[in-house]
Amino acid sequence: MVPVLRNAEARDLWATAAEVARLAEAARSGRATRDELSGSTITITSLGPRGGIVTTPIINAPEVAIVGVNRIVERPAIRGGMVVPRLSMNLSSSFDHRIVDGYTAAEFIQRIRSLLETPARIFMEA
């Protein structure tokens, strides 16, 4: 079951979080309505808590895309010429290229990456 967050573009971060919590509780308790579980265009799935580092998410028809959020792991990174530990997370995605151009899909994923790397931007742009 995938609860559907409607009008996400019109919500601020706090309203989005509240609605996600409400929908998740309705789905877990079996009280979600048919309307709350259908009509979506994109799914965000998280296999990170199950240990997924790299996944290949499958689009839920008739949606146009799915984005998989994977586990955060510590990896070596170079900072100032030194190798240092850095937390890193892979995003996996699948897009229906009959509907979404690959370049547009890549820009979308890069935008998500940018916001996750600098979360303060979420508040600045709201």
Residue ranges and their predicted role:
Residues 1-126:
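C-terminal catalytic/motor cores of large multi-domain enzyme assemblies
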